[in-house]
Curated annotation (Swiss-Prot):
Belongs to the SKI family. Pfam families: c-SKI_SMAD_bind, Ski_Sno_DHD. Residues 654-663, 670-679 have a biased composition (Acidic residues). Its main location: nucleus. GO terms for cellular component: cytoplasm; dendrite; neuronal cell body; nucleus; transcription regulator complex. This is SKI family transcriptional corepressor 1. GO terms for molecular function: DNA-binding transcription factor activity, RNA polymerase II-specific; RNA polymerase II cis-regulatory region sequence-specific DNA binding; sequence-specific double-stranded DNA binding; SMAD binding. It comes from Homo sapiens. The keyword Transcription applies. Residues 858-922 form a coiled coil. It is found in: Nucleus. InterPro entries: c-SKI_SMAD4-bd_dom (IPR014890), DNA-bd_dom_put_sf (IPR009061), SAND-like_dom_sf (IPR010919), SKI/SNO/DAC (IPR003380), Ski_DNA-bd_sf (IPR037000), Tscrpt_reg_SKI_SnoN (IPR023216).
Length: 965
């Protein structure tokens, strides 16, 4: 703010009312509003990368309103940026203190007050309560709600420590290797020792060496360990609870330097606070990346659309969540290169991913290095996914969004931000897409949205990485990842990968719709290309995906690059499918299938599935050069999964009824046409006129044409083109691509079957064994490429197989149905990875004898499909049997449970009766005793009265009163 004002101090004596504000030129409040509205971003930009808010709380402190403490006046109001969030500060007792309540409600809003309080106590941070006057100042400054009754204020250093303990990386401070703190405690007789940070790797680590007996203790135990020296006096430790060592252990050197005492504070803050929910944001971006360094950045990139690299600042500002400012700064810091390729890192967390990303954008790397997570604005799902190795967790939902990323929320950021950053970003993306860092430039010529593989892909993928860095990184990561992990959506295949096609009828229907959708998508793609990724619904996926999906899985990662390739929106916008948004594929796979028939509105469909679809189908088709291959490659995976059904529908517009034939025969021509238009390499597809393709341009085509159409399905045509480019396209996939290419030629019906089997085990969906699955799958797919349906079918099968576990969208029955239709769909759009492989092969073949090959493929596919159908029927029966046995077991259990409950009720009744009887008896006994007591009491009373009251008789009486003393 100070910077904003250009004044060294934006000190507002809020009491002075507004005048003082106006004195500052930009009122404090006004400035604050400005910051809130995005001024921060501007600010950070001005500050320069170094200062961005992002790098660390410290780097932010520069936003402090005042310069020196000497200038601090009592109750002077200022604003400090903590982790990029403006926090109101007040000078109390000559010290600038921040409003803890405001910090809790902004930076730490994901934590409960309890957690925050406990952590604060554990860190030994004391809160200063403000006076009513100060509270009023804070209210007027907007830090506290009007209804607040009290507010604790902590120093900036304490606020940084508190936030760092929640949001910061869990890393020990950088200290010399053999460094040790000389510590003492005064519990009981007291003791002193050396606290060795290097040994402090868990809360119970024996890291303190006693200075007297040289034994090692954990901090918790050390405070209970004391040596009675002659001059020691016994002190009863107060509150020696599990957290107390931080209070009792002190540096023996009272005059330690600030640096040392801060390091000590940081060390004490480690392993504090029980379960530490790291902010997702950090993880999201960073986690994926290298977890810390590029963590924040990655997240920024992902969330902010990476800020689109250079354009990040402006771009980000628009849609970004709170962390936007950081992100922005970060990205900017990262420099146009693009944030670290969160994409790569995120995607695989491979070494390449981690370092590659940074590499691509040196600055990106730097920015990425931000250790502190950007404000954890992103959705909760983020971090986790990005952090997890995707392979292990196939996405439970069909769509990445499942993660709770709020696609809508981030969409603009992801989609818009990245695309906007498109050019810069784009170029990077292009590079990645192309399969080379060099690809960047090529990509850059593409429309911003599409151009950047990342940009385009990002649209859908939610800006994977930020810009060039991302692409380059993506490419590298993709390549690395590809080798390591197949490009298939294996990681989150379950969700989207299962391309549960809609029912056959629906498919044909959907196909028509798909065609329309494809057209819409194409338009969207064009828009996206123009730089309006948002429009594409891909953006939605992107948003969720961008942050989530991309990081989510290598497959996403691969996809990203592929998408990027495929994303060359250089293709005519209409033709160019939307940048393939890999994420959508994932989610789309099942979703599209299920709902395709339902969505009649082409535009809506395009928006909903188009992006994904296009991402799949179009992605590959779109990517004209190698990039396309790459994109297609990945896309196909997803395509095959999500797009497959969708695309198949789309292409099937013509051949709705017979997906197989249509896919390869009918679709082919269209696809070819569209593809050719879309990509120079698409000639093989060449069959269809743009018209059909346009409808679903690449999307439709891809979806429609197994391989022939766009890459979605077979990517056949496209993949073929890719054959040449596959290396580039597949660079991300590297070996896989090569293998695929090789295999593609090999593709044979058996492959399809094999592919199926493989898939069943892991399948792209399988995820856990992506590499293994991938190769075989790819192989099979390649072979099945020959059999258009084969591969698709195989892919289908796998997804199907996995479907039960992975696909949330379909019931087992549904699954079976989908599987049944799947083969058809698959044939229609064999976009599965296999598809891509076989697609390339098929495409290659198609180039020469598209129709002939297609016929063969059709026949083969049919056999394969029949096999698959039988397998599916068996599987279905098996599933039904299992379901029946489960049902029976459940019913038995219920009966047992009921019997048990009845028994319990009876026993309770008995117990109750028994207790009631006992109570009655007790009552009676008590009553009897009371009666007896009463009688005794009366008798006594009577007796004593007689004794004490002598009778005075008149007249002669034999009674003689006792002699009283």
């Amino acid at each position: 703010m100070a910077l904003l004002c250009g004044l060294g101090q934006v000190t507002l004596r809020i009491w002075v009312s507004l005048p003082s504000q106006s004195e500052n030129g930009i009122g404090f409040l006004a400035a604050r509003a400005f910051l809130r509205s995005g001024g921060m971003e501007a600010l950070t930009t001005q500050l320069g990368p170094g200062r961005e808010g992002s790098s660390s709380p410290n780097s932010k402190q520069e936003l402090q309103p005042y310069s020196g403490s000497s200038a601090l006046k009592p109750n002077q109001v200022g604003e400090t940026s903590l982790y990029g969030v403006p926090i109101v500060s007040l000078v109390i007792d000559g010290q600038e203190r921040l409003c803890l309540a405001q910090i809790s409600n902004t930076l730490l809003k994901n934590y409960s007050y309890n957690e925050i309080h406990n952590r604060r106590v554990a860190l030994g941070i004391t809160c200063v309560q403000c006076t009513p006057v100060q509270l009023e100042i804070l209210r007027r400054a907007g830090a506290m709600p009007i209804s607040s009754r009290r507010c604790g204020m902590i120093t900036k250093r304490e606020a940084e420590r508190l936030c760092k303990s929640f949001l910061g990386e869990h890393k020990p401070p950088k200290l010399p290797e053999n460094f040790a703190f000389d510590v003492v405690h005064e519990c009981a007789w007291g003791s002193r020792g050396s606290f060795i940070p290097a040994r402090y790797n868990s809360s119970r680590a024996k890291c303190i060496k006693c200075g007297y007996c040289s034994m090692y203790f954990s901090p918790n135990k050390f405070i209970f360990h004391s040596h009675r020296t002659p001059d020691a006096k016994y002190t009863q430790p107060d509150a020696a609870n599990f957290n107390s060592w931080r209070r009792h252990l002190k540096l023996s050197d009272k005059s330690a330097t600030d640096e040392l005492s801060h390091a000590w504070e940081d060390v004490k803050a480690m392993f504090n606070g029980g379960t530490r929910k790291r902010t997702f944001s950090l993880q999201g971006g960073g986690g994926g990346g290298a977890n810390g360094g590029s963590g924040g950045q990655g997240k920024g990139g992902a969330g902010g659309g990476g800020g689109g690299g250079p354009g990040c600042g402006a771009e980000m500002a628009p849609g970004p969540p709170p962390h936007k400012s950081l992100r922005c700064g970060e990205d900017e810091a990262a420099g146009p290169p693009g944030p670290p390729p969160p994409h790569p890192q995120r995607g695989l967390g491979l070494a390449t991913g981690a370092s590659g990303p940074a590499g691509p954008g040196g600055p990106g790397g730097g920015a990425g290095v931000r250790s502190y997570p950007v404000i954890p604005v992103p959705s909760k799902g983020f971090g986790l996914l990005q952090k997890l190795p995707p392979p292990l967790f196939p996405h439970p939902y069909g769509f990445p969004t499942a993660f709770g990323l709020c696609p809508k929320k981030d969409d603009p950021v992801l989609g818009a931000g990245e695309p906007k950053g498109g050019p810069g970003t784009g170029s990077g993306g292009g590079g990645a897409g192309t399969g080379g860092g060099a690809g960047g430039p090529g990509a850059s010529h593409l429309p911003p949205g599409a151009g950047a593989g990342p940009g385009g892909g990002a649209m859908f993928w939610g800006h994977q990485p930020s810009g060039a860095a991302k692409d380059a990184a993506a490419v590298a990561a993709a390549a690395a990842a590809a080798t390591v992990y197949p490009t298939f959506p294996m990681f989150w295949p379950a969700a989207g990968s299962l391309p549960v096609p809609s029912y056959p009828a629906a498919q044909s229907q959907a196909k028509a719709v798909a065609a329309a959708v494809a057209a819409a998508a194409a338009a969207a793609a064009a828009a996206a290309g123009s730089g309006a990724p948002e429009p594409l619904d891909g953006a939605e996926p992107a948003k969720e995906s961008g942050l989530g999906a991309e990081e989510r899985c290598p497959s996403a990662l691969s996809r990203g690059p592929l998408d990027e390739d495929g994303t060359d929106e250089a293709l005519p916008p209409p033709l160019a499918p939307l940048p393939p948004p890999p994420p959508p594929p994932a989610r789309k796979g099942s979703y599209v299938s299920a709902f395709r028939p339902v969505v009649k509105d082409t535009e809506s469909i395009a928006k909903l599935y188009g992006s994904a679809r296009e991402a799949y189908g179009a992605g590959p088709a779109r990517g004209p050069g190698p990039g396309a291959g790459s994109g297609g490659y990945v896309s196909p995976d997803f395509l095959s999964e999500g797009s497959s059904s969708y695309n198949s529908a789309s292409p099937d517009v013509d051949t709705a009824d017979e997906p197989e034939v249509d896919v390869e025969s009918n679709r082919f021509p269209d696809d070819e046409d569209a593809q050719e238009e879309t990509e120079p390499s698409a000639p093989s597809a060449g069959g269809g006129p743009d018209g059909e393709q346009p409808t679903g341009p690449p999307s439709a085509t891809s979806s429609g044409a197994d391989g022939p159409a766009n890459s979605p399905d077979g990517g056949s045509p496209r993949p073929r083109r890719r054959l040449g480019p596959p290396p580039a396209g597949r660079p991300a996939f590297g070996d896989l691509a090569a293998e695929d290419l090789v295999r593609r030629p090999e593709r044979s019906p058996p492959s399809g079957g094999g592919g199926y089997e493989l898939r069943e085990p892991c399948g792209p969906l399988g995820g856990p064994a992506p590499a293994k699955v991938f190769a075989p799958e790819r192989d099979e797919h390649v072979k099945s490429a020959a059999v258009a349906l084969g591969p698709a079918a195989s892919y289908v099968c796998t997804p199907e197989a996995h479907e039960p576990d992975k696909e949330d969208n379909h019931s087992p029955a549904d699954d079976l149905e989908t599987r049944k239709s799947y083969p058809d769909q698959r044939s229609i759009s064999q976009p599965s990875p296999a598809n891509t492989d076989r697609g390339e092969d098929g495409l290659t073949l198609d180039v020469t004898g598209t129709h002939l090959v297609e016929k063969d493929i059709e026949n083969l596919a049919r056999e394969e499909l029949q096999k698959l159908l039988l397998e599916q029927m068996e599987l279905r029966k098996k599933l039904e049997r299992e379901f029946q046995s489960l049902k029976d077991n459940f019913q038995d259990q219920m009966k047992r449970e009921l019997a048990y409950r009845e028994e319990m009720v009876q026993q309770l009744q008995i117990v109750r009766d028994t207790l009631c009887n006992e109570l009655d008896q007790e009552r009676k006994a008590r009553y009897a005793i009371q009666q007896k007591l009463k009688e005794a009491h009366d008798a006594l009373h009577h007796f004593s009265c007689k004794m004490l009251t002598p009778r005075h008789c008149t007249g002669n009486c034999s009674f003689k009163p006792p002699l009283l003393p």
